[in-house]
């Protein structure tokens, strides 16, 4: 990765490769084994039965990278205002934007027939995204989050909003595991939702995470990545050890993950002082091209209903 960038202390880097060598002692493309709670929508610079323990993963400088991030989020209040960095006001706008992006994707990929849908909420924090959004669309949502007091808050928050009946909507499993160490169950998820957390992963762990996570998707399943976007290159936040990547940076990483962009949408109506936010729907199959050169959207096809 050759994008130029800088950190929050003003240090400039000629490339992402240089920055990662400095921060974790590894080249950006080095293959390794993939975040931390849903971090706040960051100001433009100069997540959501508990299993596992809080871990940093890796060794040496890489371990320090993750340990610092965990330590930062351990000091944050387990509330909407806390996980959104004092910008709790963006919650409703965020949920509205996510709903508008996801709803047509579900109809296109899975059809309108009655079905049992399962999602994974990555870097789930206190369960904000699951409670306010994902449970509207999915019968089951699993949450993965490395900060224990956030996940404990998520369990409490989600207990009160369970719908019990023939068509149950519930938070099913809570995993206290960092993304760099997490591997989903094979073929469990229709959608893997990753919001405001992937910036905690260095590029190599980003690629490794998505490569492992692919096995967790059902037929026609897809990823949604919703993340802050730098105008150019990258911005490294030294306070919580997170990186804000540009659109071009993300697209290069998607290629390295063997993922294809199905659709993209900007999140609107955020405060002007915040980074721009984009939503990417990512699929594992290459979009088919029609004779007129346009991508052909896949037709819905009958499939076995899986829980």
UniProtKB/Swiss-Prot annotation:
Keywords: Methyltransferase, S-adenosyl-L-methionine, Transferase
MF terms in GO: methyltransferase activity; N-terminal protein N-methyltransferase activity
Binding-site list for S-adenosyl-L-methionine: 123, 128, 145-147, 179-180, 195
UniProt-listed InterPro entries: MeTrfase_NTM1 (IPR008576), SAM-dependent_MTases_sf (IPR029063)
GO BP terms, alphabetized: methylation
Enzyme type, top EC level: transferase
Region: Disordered, residue numbers: 38-60
Domain of life where this protein originates: Eukaryota
Cellular component terms per the entry's GO annotation: cytoplasm
CDD domains assigned to the protein according to its UniProt record, in alphabetical order: AdoMet_MTases
Disulphide linkage map: none
Pfam families in alphabetical order: Methyltransf_PK
ATP-binding among keywords: no
Enzyme Commission code: 2.1.1.244
UniProt xrefs under Gene3D superfamilies: Vaccinia Virus protein VP39
Sequence ranges of Low complexity compositional bias: 38-51
Catalytic activity: N-terminal L-alanyl-L-prolyl-L-lysyl-[protein] + 3 S-adenosyl-L-methionine = N-terminal N,N,N-trimethyl-L-alanyl-L-prolyl-L-lysyl-[protein] + 3 S-adenosyl-L-homocysteine + 3 H(+); N-terminal L-seryl-L-prolyl-L-lysyl-[protein] + 3 S-adenosyl-L-methionine = N-terminal N,N,N-trimethyl-L-seryl-L-prolyl-L-lysyl-[protein] + 3 S-adenosyl-L-homocysteine + 3 H(+); N-terminal L-prolyl-L-prolyl-L-lysyl-[protein] + 2 S-adenosyl-L-methionine = N-terminal N,N-dimethyl-L-prolyl-L-prolyl-L-lysyl-[protein] + 2 S-adenosyl-L-homocysteine + 2 H(+)
Functional note: Alpha-N-methyltransferase that methylates the N-terminus of target proteins containing the N-terminal motif [Ala/Pro/Ser]-Pro-Lys when the initiator Met is cleaved. Specifically catalyzes mono-, di- or tri-methylation of exposed alpha-amino group of Ala or Ser residue in the [Ala/Ser]-Pro-Lys motif and mono- or di-methylation of Pro in the Pro-Pro-Lys motif.
Similarity remark: Belongs to the methyltransferase superfamily. NTM1 family.
Protein's name in the database: Alpha N-terminal protein methyltransferase 1
